[in-house]
Amino acid sequence: MIQKCIALSLFLFSALPEDNIVRALSLSPNNPKSNVVMVMSDAFDGRLTLLPENGLVSLPYINFMKKHGALFLNAYTNSPICCPSRAAMWSGLFPHLTESWNNYKCLDSDYPTWMDIVEKNGYVTQRLGKQDYKSGSHSLSNRVEAWTRDVPFLLRQEGRPCANLTGNKTQTRVMALDWKNVDTATAWIQKAAQNHSQPFFLYLGLNLPHPYPSETMGENFGSSTFLTSPYWLQKVPYKNVTIPKWKPLQSMHPVDYYSSYTKNCTAPFTEQEIRDIRAYYYAMCAEADGLLGEIISALNDTGLLGRTYVVFTSDHGELAMEHRQFYKMSMYEGSSHIPLLIMGPRISPGQQISTVVSLVDLYPTMLEIAGVQIPQNISGYSLMPLLSASSNKNVSPSISVHPNWAMSEFHGSDANASTYMLWDNYWKYVAYADGDSVAPQLFDLSSDPDELTNVAGQVPEKVQEMDKKLRSIVDYPKVSASVHVYNKQQFALWKASVGANYTNVIANLRWHADWNKRPRAYEMAIEKWIKSTRQH
């Protein structure tokens, strides 16, 4: 029955005349207020949306949105980790402005989001699935690792990444929770279609294509398993899956080496292992696309597609073994470049917009669609002027209202320094900590899209220019110092709360395999760090 539903959804859009779709999406709705559906995936590499159709993985519904809406070619996360990135999207503010430092410290539970604002202005609202923008979530291990990242020890904190196959060629529902939430969302859309008098905003958060938990890691397991079924894996032309180039371990930037080690990626991998991880990840992206398709199909079936804005994006990307890492927590393209597609009323089809944008821009965009006044003190800019700027299928020029730079920051686990990225005209500048204690990196994406050559030492004048601009946006040495103080305070509070059981608890976190080789030495390293005045 599930297989039949998927096939029916695909049939609807392969059989629906293209001119009918274009006409439906361009007509002004009778109700001046349009609906909005936002689908936010987790860990979706935005570069996949830039590829030719079916080149690496079959993504029919993303391609449908590309054809009938707008694709942002340069969309970036404001923090390559779950909770802070989502806090930026919901608040419209850079993470340092809300002190969203890690997966445990984000927005307060009563923080007014853009959805709260549109609800007060007459919209019916619904949030379903993964939201993950409030403080207090994620595992104990995750937060302790984030707090202690400045301690000078090196411990593996993640399971070794692996690829697992489940089910058979007819199994479509691998991520059961996502499918359950999509079923709830489609039922909600069907019910909303019966009420034509009140517009709605629907948010749906997916878990896919985030790696699955690795329960073999013990009590405090992380997520390092790329899991899919043969049904989705057949959507990936295996011969097209590439093996990324790696620098020798001894040549890696020190923060990259720390990340590779803590992510359990410094041991040898066979080409087969790497290719499987990447292929399975792409298959997980195909399943996420199928979930998006259920939402688009529901809007089409209920006659709401023509008066609904559909947004597809992600909190961050996935490295999938690029730069000898998996997961995110990095400013490399696989981790920081996110998908962003928008289609809906009055959006010209087939647009490819080159202006660099980020998640904070969705806050004012949602408010503008809702006809609500946009606050002046936010970090983002509405994307609506860009979306209505061009009526042809060529790349739309940059609009002066929106700056042509993006900023991202990271303060969580699996990286041993606060990290800041400035993207400006295809230059990517990455600064760390206080700007002096850790060397920066600079990449020319126009000639080095794989980011294998750090040219910071070759063009010092460009480094100086980019660093000056970054400091005009964020006083990053001051922010790094604040995070350092926060980490110490929170760790001390947690240690006091654990009491006499501290030694046992800290030894059994995700790093337990390494920790238990020299437990006393690691405890002493933490004690020395707590007492130090150095602000890294």
Swiss-Prot record:
The conversion to 3-oxoalanine (also known as C-formylglycine, FGly), of a serine or cysteine residue in prokaryotes and of a cysteine residue in eukaryotes, is critical for catalytic activity. Substrate binds at residues 130, 253. Its cofactor is Ca(2+). It catalyses: an aryl sulfate + H2O = a phenol + sulfate + H(+); Hydrolysis of the 2-sulfate groups of the 2-O-sulfo-D-glucuronate residues of chondroitin sulfate, heparin and heparitin sulfate. It is found in: Secreted; Lysosome. Binds 1 Ca(2+) ion per subunit. Keywords: Calcium, Glycoprotein, Hydrolase, Lysosome, Metal-binding, Secreted, Signal. This is Arylsulfatase K. It comes from Xenopus laevis.
